[in-house]
Amino acid sequence: MTPPGRLYLRRVCSTPILLLLGLLLALPPEAQGLPGVGLPPSAAQPAHQHPPKHLARGTLKPAAHLVGDPSTPDSLRWRANTDRAFLRHGFLLSNNSLLVPTSGLYFVYSQVVFSGEGCFPKATPTPLYLAHEVQLFSSQYPFHVPLLSAQKSVCPGPQGPWVRSVYQGAVFLLTQGDQLSTHTDGTPHLLLSPSSVFFGAFAL
Protein backbone atom coordinates (compact mmCIF):
# COMPACT_ATOMS: atom_id res chain seq x y z
CA MET A 1 0.00 0.00 0.00
CA THR A 2 1.40 3.38 -1.15
CA PRO A 3 1.99 5.89 1.64
CA PRO A 4 -0.30 8.98 1.46
CA GLY A 5 2.63 11.39 1.06
CA ARG A 6 4.12 9.57 -1.93
CA LEU A 7 0.69 9.30 -3.64
CA TYR A 8 0.16 13.05 -3.27
CA LEU A 9 3.62 13.75 -4.76
CA ARG A 10 2.90 11.53 -7.80
CA ARG A 11 -0.39 13.35 -8.46
CA VAL A 12 1.32 16.74 -8.23
CA CYS A 13 4.10 15.74 -10.67
CA SER A 14 1.70 14.27 -13.23
CA THR A 15 -0.57 17.34 -13.34
CA PRO A 16 1.73 19.56 -15.54
CA ILE A 17 2.27 16.69 -18.00
CA LEU A 18 -1.48 16.23 -18.44
CA LEU A 19 -1.94 19.97 -18.98
CA LEU A 20 0.78 20.06 -21.71
CA LEU A 21 -0.71 17.02 -23.44
CA GLY A 22 -4.14 18.66 -23.46
CA LEU A 23 -2.79 21.87 -24.98
CA LEU A 24 -0.93 19.92 -27.69
CA LEU A 25 -4.04 17.99 -28.69
CA ALA A 26 -6.02 21.23 -28.89
CA LEU A 27 -3.67 22.67 -31.55
CA PRO A 28 -4.46 22.20 -35.29
CA PRO A 29 -2.60 19.28 -36.95
CA GLU A 30 -0.24 21.49 -39.00
CA ALA A 31 0.91 23.27 -35.80
CA GLN A 32 1.74 19.91 -34.18
CA GLY A 33 4.53 19.34 -36.71
CA LEU A 34 3.00 16.15 -38.13
CA PRO A 35 4.40 15.59 -41.67
CA GLY A 36 1.79 15.72 -44.44
CA VAL A 37 -1.12 16.24 -42.01
CA GLY A 38 -3.33 19.25 -42.51
CA LEU A 39 -1.48 20.34 -45.69
CA PRO A 40 -3.06 20.70 -49.13
CA PRO A 41 -2.38 17.75 -51.50
CA SER A 42 0.08 19.78 -53.60
CA ALA A 43 2.18 20.69 -50.55
CA ALA A 44 2.22 17.13 -49.21
CA GLN A 45 3.73 15.68 -52.42
CA PRO A 46 7.49 15.08 -52.68
CA ALA A 47 9.43 17.92 -54.32
CA HIS A 48 11.38 15.61 -56.66
CA GLN A 49 8.45 14.59 -58.86
CA HIS A 50 9.15 14.80 -62.61
CA PRO A 51 6.95 16.87 -64.97
CA PRO A 52 4.37 14.99 -67.05
CA LYS A 53 5.80 13.37 -70.15
CA HIS A 54 3.43 15.21 -72.50
CA LEU A 55 4.84 18.55 -71.33
CA ALA A 56 8.41 17.42 -72.00
CA ARG A 57 7.49 16.25 -75.49
CA GLY A 58 5.82 19.56 -76.28
CA THR A 59 9.13 21.39 -76.01
CA LEU A 60 10.71 19.34 -78.84
CA LYS A 61 9.87 21.58 -81.80
CA PRO A 62 10.76 20.76 -85.42
CA ALA A 63 13.96 22.38 -86.71
CA ALA A 64 16.22 22.00 -89.73
CA HIS A 65 19.50 23.56 -90.88
CA LEU A 66 21.02 22.67 -94.27
CA VAL A 67 24.30 23.63 -95.92
CA GLY A 68 25.32 23.73 -99.56
CA ASP A 69 27.08 20.72 -101.07
CA PRO A 70 30.48 21.79 -102.48
CA SER A 71 30.68 18.67 -104.65
CA THR A 72 28.03 20.09 -107.02
CA PRO A 73 29.32 23.59 -107.91
CA ASP A 74 27.03 23.99 -110.94
CA SER A 75 23.85 23.54 -108.88
CA LEU A 76 22.88 24.27 -105.30
CA ARG A 77 22.22 20.96 -103.57
CA TRP A 78 21.42 20.87 -99.85
CA ARG A 79 22.72 18.35 -97.34
CA ALA A 80 21.81 17.67 -93.72
CA ASN A 81 24.37 15.15 -92.50
CA THR A 82 27.55 17.18 -92.09
CA ASP A 83 29.09 20.49 -90.97
CA ARG A 84 26.58 21.15 -88.16
CA ALA A 85 23.62 20.62 -90.49
CA PHE A 86 20.70 18.66 -89.04
CA LEU A 87 17.06 17.59 -89.28
CA ARG A 88 15.15 17.36 -85.99
CA HIS A 89 11.73 16.27 -84.77
CA GLY A 90 9.95 15.50 -88.04
CA PHE A 91 11.68 17.55 -90.74
CA LEU A 92 12.70 15.58 -93.86
CA LEU A 93 14.90 16.46 -96.84
CA SER A 94 13.47 15.02 -100.07
CA ASN A 95 14.28 16.01 -103.66
CA ASN A 96 16.27 18.99 -102.36
CA SER A 97 13.18 20.28 -100.49
CA LEU A 98 12.32 20.51 -96.79
CA LEU A 99 9.07 18.75 -95.86
CA VAL A 100 7.15 20.53 -93.08
CA PRO A 101 6.15 17.98 -90.37
CA THR A 102 3.38 19.85 -88.54
CA SER A 103 1.20 22.90 -89.13
CA GLY A 104 2.10 26.13 -87.36
CA LEU A 105 4.30 29.21 -87.38
CA TYR A 106 7.85 28.77 -88.68
CA PHE A 107 10.83 31.05 -89.07
CA VAL A 108 12.30 30.35 -92.52
CA TYR A 109 15.76 31.65 -93.42
CA SER A 110 18.49 31.32 -96.03
CA GLN A 111 21.82 32.86 -96.95
CA VAL A 112 24.04 32.68 -100.02
CA VAL A 113 27.37 34.35 -100.78
CA PHE A 114 28.55 35.02 -104.34
CA SER A 115 32.12 35.84 -105.38
CA GLY A 116 33.98 36.57 -108.61
CA GLU A 117 37.31 37.59 -110.07
CA GLY A 118 36.04 40.90 -111.40
CA CYS A 119 34.13 42.49 -114.27
CA PHE A 120 35.98 42.52 -117.58
CA PRO A 121 36.26 45.98 -119.12
CA LYS A 122 34.26 46.16 -122.33
CA ALA A 123 32.60 48.87 -124.33
CA THR A 124 29.25 47.29 -123.52
CA PRO A 125 29.82 44.93 -120.55
CA THR A 126 27.31 42.13 -120.05
CA PRO A 127 25.39 42.59 -116.77
CA LEU A 128 25.76 39.81 -114.19
CA TYR A 129 22.58 39.24 -112.23
CA LEU A 130 22.53 37.25 -109.00
CA ALA A 131 19.32 36.05 -107.35
CA HIS A 132 18.25 33.74 -104.54
CA GLU A 133 14.70 32.72 -103.67
CA VAL A 134 12.97 30.50 -101.10
CA GLN A 135 9.86 28.90 -102.56
CA LEU A 136 6.79 27.16 -101.17
CA PHE A 137 5.00 24.27 -102.85
CA SER A 138 1.72 23.42 -101.11
CA SER A 139 -1.46 21.49 -101.74
CA GLN A 140 -3.22 24.85 -101.56
CA TYR A 141 -1.04 26.22 -104.39
CA PRO A 142 -0.17 23.69 -107.14
CA PHE A 143 2.89 25.74 -108.16
CA HIS A 144 5.98 27.20 -106.49
CA VAL A 145 5.17 30.42 -104.62
CA PRO A 146 8.06 32.78 -103.71
CA LEU A 147 8.34 33.34 -99.95
CA LEU A 148 11.69 35.15 -99.83
CA SER A 149 13.40 36.73 -102.83
CA ALA A 150 16.44 38.96 -103.41
CA GLN A 151 18.41 40.10 -106.47
CA LYS A 152 21.77 41.80 -106.99
CA SER A 153 23.63 43.09 -110.04
CA VAL A 154 27.43 43.05 -110.13
CA CYS A 155 28.69 43.92 -113.61
CA PRO A 156 29.41 46.52 -114.76
CA GLY A 157 31.26 47.17 -111.54
CA PRO A 158 34.63 46.67 -109.85
CA GLN A 159 37.61 45.55 -111.89
CA GLY A 160 39.00 43.43 -109.05
CA PRO A 161 37.54 40.52 -107.05
CA TRP A 162 34.08 41.05 -105.59
CA VAL A 163 31.84 39.39 -102.97
CA ARG A 164 28.08 39.77 -102.52
CA SER A 165 26.00 38.23 -99.73
CA VAL A 166 22.24 37.77 -99.48
CA TYR A 167 20.44 36.89 -96.23
CA GLN A 168 16.67 36.52 -95.92
CA GLY A 169 14.37 35.41 -93.10
CA ALA A 170 10.74 35.81 -92.04
CA VAL A 171 7.89 34.07 -90.18
CA PHE A 172 5.29 32.09 -92.14
CA LEU A 173 2.21 30.05 -91.30
CA LEU A 174 2.88 26.65 -92.86
CA THR A 175 0.80 23.50 -93.22
CA GLN A 176 1.85 19.91 -92.65
CA GLY A 177 3.18 18.50 -95.92
CA ASP A 178 4.31 21.85 -97.35
CA GLN A 179 7.59 21.79 -99.27
CA LEU A 180 10.27 24.47 -98.92
CA SER A 181 12.90 24.76 -101.64
CA THR A 182 15.28 27.33 -103.15
CA HIS A 183 16.07 28.69 -106.60
CA THR A 184 19.36 30.48 -107.35
CA ASP A 185 20.66 32.40 -110.37
CA GLY A 186 24.44 32.66 -110.53
CA THR A 187 25.28 29.28 -108.98
CA PRO A 188 28.79 29.17 -110.59
CA HIS A 189 29.67 32.16 -108.38
CA LEU A 190 28.48 30.61 -105.10
CA LEU A 191 31.00 30.49 -102.28
CA LEU A 192 30.05 27.03 -101.04
CA SER A 193 31.10 26.87 -97.40
CA PRO A 194 28.90 25.88 -94.41
CA SER A 195 29.08 29.38 -92.91
CA SER A 196 28.24 31.14 -96.19
CA VAL A 197 25.51 29.11 -97.88
CA PHE A 198 22.73 27.66 -95.71
CA PHE A 199 18.97 27.17 -95.56
CA GLY A 200 16.67 26.22 -92.69
CA ALA A 201 13.48 26.60 -90.69
CA PHE A 202 12.28 26.06 -87.13
CA ALA A 203 8.89 26.04 -85.41
CA LEU A 204 8.00 28.88 -83.05
Curated annotation (Swiss-Prot):
Pfam family, one: TNF
GO molecular function: cytokine activity; tumor necrosis factor receptor binding
Domain THD: residue ranges: 62-204
Domain of life of the source: Eukaryota
InterPro entries recorded: TNF, TNF_beta, TNF_CS, TNF_dom, Tumour_necrosis_fac-like_dom
GO terms under cellular component: extracellular space; membrane
Assigned protein family: Belongs to the tumor necrosis factor family.
Quaternary structure and partners: Homotrimer, and heterotrimer of either two LTB and one LTA subunits or (less prevalent) two LTA and one LTB subunits. Interacts with TNFRSF14.
Function in brief: Cytokine that in its homotrimeric form binds to TNFRSF1A/TNFR1, TNFRSF1B/TNFBR and TNFRSF14/HVEM. In its heterotrimeric form with LTB binds to TNFRSF3/LTBR. Lymphotoxin is produced by lymphocytes and is cytotoxic for a wide range of tumor cells in vitro and in vivo.
Protein name listed in UniProt: Lymphotoxin-alpha
Species the sequence originates in: Sus scrofa
UniProt gene name: LTA
